[in-house]
Swiss-Prot record:
Belongs to the FliF family. GO terms for molecular function: cytoskeletal motor activity. It comes from Caulobacter vibrioides (strain ATCC 19089 / CIP 103742 / CB 15). The keyword Cell inner membrane applies. InterPro entries: AMP-bd_C_sf, Flag_M-ring_C, FlgMring_FliF, FliF_N_dom, YscJ/FliF. Keywords: Bacterial flagellum, Cell inner membrane, Cell membrane, Membrane, Transmembrane, Transmembrane helix. Residues 247-300 are annotated as: Disordered. It is found in: Cell inner membrane; Bacterial flagellum basal body. This is Flagellar M-ring protein.
Length: 536
């Protein structure tokens, strides 16, 4: 009993000391040892208690001091995320430096700035950036392209493809003439996260697009069915076949009935020609000066004219360019499982009767699903709705989930501490306080406690012993003795050893007990049995 009590007290003291300790929270992690030393010195000067974990790179401070400690450390510039940025040019003197040193400092500064930017992303714990910047040569025809390698630490989870592409685009946009595919992204386990080629990147994007379409359609169908049947009454699975080809179509159409005069032009031409007739004879008129035929020839004349009209018509023409982006649904298959109707649980705890859905209800739900997904039988779409009995969740599990909802890790730990404290207090009551109270309510040292077969308020009666003396005995209502009065305290009793048992008893008490056993054997056996039962 003493050992159990001491153990309970020790546990209680340890628990009180643990609960009395101020809760701590993370200040910085994964620090460089030099920076960790500077931060701890600053915390000592500010009088802020701290605790280091791991190899010294993790610093914990009291929860109510986290904000002030971070502001103090940031104000002193003690933590630079382990990377050197453009501040390297603030301390170095450019005079006397060679071109190689200047280029190296420029590369280090660019790498440090990229590391800081990438580390600011959510989920990134550590990062290293290595840039390969080829030196430009005069009169070069094929310039070597720059490249980069980025190593990120993201813990136990795998970064998404969007994060990897964002890192590639960030690094390639920060370095002149660098392409995104020239940036290799690797995690802390040595796994390559960046796509090695455009084809694999396109395949990954296609798979993401397919998963996105299937999830969107499944959510739409499930929300619609659960809005009709109730929450948790539907399970939906969608398989979509997408056309991932990007098609550009250009079409020209001419309308002959829509012709319009564009331009008109008219050309008029005329000419006149006179000539002598050599076949005409000699006449008197030809010999008269100034008369007709004075030249001796007869003149013949001709006149020609030409009119040209040109009309240009513009025919109506329409040009249509159609671009079909990848992701068009070619075929879709939807599988829906719906639950039946379950009656409320009976008073004796038995589940209620289950009633499956009727064929008419299943047909109505199938029509709703076809309308929601844009069902097209010509392209081979399939929709199947089946009634299946769902397993009912346990009420206890739901209650536990509801109780834990809304509590963070600190609240759960605090509740666990209070629970342990309550258990320790209960153990103290059972093993320390209860025996103490029991001892207080026990008979006086001068009495021997006896147990009777029946209960009730005790009474006292005189019992004649073998030597003729009378002894007071405490009995219950049925007359069974439950206590034997001891001798007066003022008597001087002789003490003897019994079978070398450690401790001593009064000789007169032993004599009286022996006489009582001889006179009342049945009651004595009952008393011994009760003692044995209490000892076990």
């Amino acid at each position: 009993m003493l050992g159990v009590g001491a153990g309970v007290v020790a546990v209680l003291v340890a628990l009180v000391m643990f609960m009395g300790k101020e809760p701590s929270e993370l200040l910085y992690s994964n620090l460089d040892l030099k920076e960790a030393s500077e931060v701890t010195q600053a915390l000592d000067q500010a009088g802020i208690k701290y605790e280091t974990k791991g190899d010294g790179s993790t610093i914990m401070v009291p929860r109510d001091k986290v904000a002030s400690a971070r502001l103090m450390v940031a104000g002193k510039g003690l933590v630079s995320s382990g990377s050197i940025g453009y501040e390297i040019f603030d301390t170095n003197n450019a005079l006397g430096q060679t071109d190689f040193v200047q280029q190296l400092n420029r590369q280090r500064a660019l790498q440090g700035e990229l590391e800081r930017t990438i580390k600011a992303m959510q989920g990134v714990n550590s990062v290293r950036v290595h840039l390969v910047l080829p030196k430009r040569q005069l009169f070069e025809e094929d310039a070597e392209q720059p490249s980069a390698a980025v190593t990120i630490g993201v813990g136990s989870r795998e970064p998404s493809s969007d994060m990897v592409r964002a890192i590639q685009n960030l690094v390639s946009s920060s370095v002149p003439n660098m392409k995104a595919e020239k940036v290799a992204v690797i995690d802390q386990h040595g796994k390559t996260l960046s796509a090695p080629s455009d084809e694999s990147l396109a395949g990954k994007m296609a798979q993401d697009r397919k998963s996105e379409v299937e999830a969107r359609i499944a959510k739409t169908v499930k929300d619609m069915i659960e809005g009709v049947l109730g929450p948790g009454k539907a399970r939906v699975n969608v398989t979509a076949e997408l056309d991932l080809n990007r098609v550009t179509t250009q079409e020209e159409r001419f309308d002959p009935d829509g012709q319009v005069i564009r331009s008109e032009s008219t050309t008029e031409a005329s000419s006149q020609e006179n000539k002598n007739d050599d076949n005409a004879g000699v006449t008197a008129a030809a010999n008269v000066p100034g008369g007709q035929g004075a030249n001796g020839f007869q003149q013949l004349g001709s006149r020609t004219g030409q009119n040209d009209a040109v009309t240009n018509y513009e025919i109506s023409k329409s040009v249509t360019t159609t671009v079909q982006e990848p992701g068009t649904i070619k075929k879709i298959a939807v599988a829906v499982a719906i639950d039946g109707v379950s009656a409320p649980m009976a008073a004796d705890g038995k589940p209620g009767a289950y009633t499956p859905r009727t064929a008419q209800e299943i047909q109505q739900i199938e029509e709703l699903v076809k309308t929601a997904v844009g069902f097209d039988a010509e392209r081979g779409d399939q929709v199947r709705v089946t009634n299946i009995k769902f397993p009912q969740p346990e009420d206890q599990g739901l209650e536990e989930q509801g109780l834990l909802a809304g509590f963070d890790k600190n609240d759960i730990m605090r509740a666990a501490e209070l629970g342990v404290l309550a258990v320790v207090a209960l153990l103290i009551l059972l093993f320390a306080v209860r025996p103490f109270i029991k001892n207080l309510s026990a008979p006086a040292p001068g009495q021997i406690a006896l147990a009777g077969p029946s209960g009730g308020p005790p009474v006292t009666r005189l019992v004649t012993l073998a030597d003729g003396t009378q002894q007071q005995v405490v009995v219950d209502q049925s007359g069974e003795p439950i206590a034997l009065a001891g001798p007066p305290v003022s008597d001087i009793d002789q003490r003897i050893d019994i079978a070398k048992i450690e401790g001593q008893v009064k000789a007169s008490s032993i004599k009286r007990v022996s006489e009582f056993v001889e006179k009342h054997p049945d009651e004595s056996v009952a008393i011994l049995r009760n003692w044995l039962h209490e000892s076990t």
